[in-house]
Amino acid sequence: MGYIKIKMKFWSQQPVFHIYNLLYWLNPSGIINKEMPVINKYTNIIDIKSYGISEIKDTLLERLCHFIKIYYIQSSNTTYSPTKTNIIEYLKCCNHESYLTLYEKNKLLFEKGQVTNSISTDIVSVITARSMNITFKNKPAFTLYYVDNLCVHPDYRKHGIAQQMIETHYYNLRKNNKKIQVCLFKREGELNAIVPLVAYKTTGYNIKNVSLFNTSSSSSFSQNQQYLNVIEIGSSQLSLLLDFVYSQKHNFECIIMPDVSNIINMIKTENIYIYGVINGTYLSAVYVFRKPNLYYEREEALECIMSIDGFTNNDNNDNNDNNCNNSQNNNNSFIAGFNISLNKIKEKLKTTILLVENTSNNNKIKYYLNKLFITQKNDILFESPTAFFLYNYVSYSIPSEKLLILY
C-alpha cells in the first residue's frame, strides 16, 4: 500500500475506490464526498478555466478542437483526425450544461523584434465533461459527468499538468453544478490501483480482406439473413430503441446512457450509427457503431461500442425441451443481424478497420469474429486493456457483459 501511495501520489489522494481500501470492499457505500471539494495543491484556478458549451466563444472552440486534433493521440502508426463536429456535438443537447476546461499560458507578442503591449495565450491542456445517466440494478438512477478528451501539450507532459486539470476540472464541475457529484472516466492501457467499474479488452480487426459476409459458408446464417429485416435507426425511430433497452434492462447490472436529446444529436451529426433487427413493431437486436476518427496505417476505423441480443436474452428466460436449439438459432440470428449491419455501415463509410469494445453483448460478436479470423487464417490487429472507473463513487466491479453503455 505504501508503494502504491508513493508511486501514484495523486490518485492515492483522489475520491476513488482504491484496491487497498478494506472499508470499501466491506461496504461499497456509493458517493464518497457529498460536500464540495476543497482547494488543494493540485487545484489551479489561476491558469485553468472552465467554460460552458453554451457560452464559450467560437474562436476558442476552433482553437480547442485544433489542439485536440493535433495532440490527443501521437503514434507512428495511428492518426486521430476529428472535425469540430466530432468533438463538440457530443457536448450539445444534454439536460445539464457540458463543460470544456482549458489550461492557457500567456505569451507576449513581438513585432519587428520589439515586445508589444499585446498578450495572446497558448493552450497547454484541454479536458471536457458531459452529463450522462447511470442506473445500477435495483437502485435509483442518478446523473454523472463523463470526463473525456484529456489532452496535454507534449512540451508540458510529465510536469503535473494532467493532475491539475483533473482536480480543477472536477472542482469547477462541482462548483457550477451542485446536482452532479460523480464522474466517469475511461482509461485505455494498463490499469492503475483503482478498482474499475468494469475492465475489458478492445479488439482491432482488419476487415478489408476478410469474408465477413459470405453467407454461403453457413447455411444457418444464410437462412437467417434471408428473413431478417435490419434497419438504420434514426431520430424518428428512437422510441423503438428506448423501448427495447427498457425491455432488456434486467439483463444488465449497470446501464449508462446519454439524454435522449443528446442521442438524437449524435445520430443527426453522424457521430454514431444505430442498426436494429426489427420484427413487426419491435426490435429483436441492436448494434451501435461510432466513428472514433482513428486511422491505423492510414486505414479508417469504425467502432462497435454496444449491442443487445434480444433473441438469446429472451430465450434464456424460457424453460422448454427445445431451449438449447432455440438458443443456437437465436444466437445465429443475432450474429447474422450484426453481419448485415456491419455490411451496411462498411459500405456507407468505406471503413476497413473494426474495433469491438467487449461490453454488453459484444462478447458474442467478439467470439464470432475471433473464430472467423482463426478459420480464415487472418491475424487480429491488437487487443488493448480498457476500463471505466467512477470518481467520487464506490461500487464493486461488474462483468463486462453486464455493462450497457452508449457514449
Task: Annotate each predicted stretch with a short phrase.
Residues 168-182:
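Classical protein tyrosine phosphatase
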Residues 181-228, 286-316, 329, 339-407:
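Active-site/acyl-donor-binding loops of N-acyltransferases
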Residues 152, 158-171, 329-345:
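Conserved acetyl-CoA-binding loop-helix of GNAT-fold acetyltransferases
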Residues 318-321:
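Acidic, Ala/Val/Gly-enriched low-complexity intrinsically disordered segments
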Residues 14-21, 25-28, 32, 56, ...:
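N-acyltransferase acceptor-side catalytic subdomain
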Residues 2-61, 210-235:
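Conserved N-terminal entry element of GNAT/NAT acetyltransferase domains
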Residues 47-154, 187-188, 232-314:
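A conserved beta-strand-loop-helix scaffold within acyl/acetyltransferase catalytic domains
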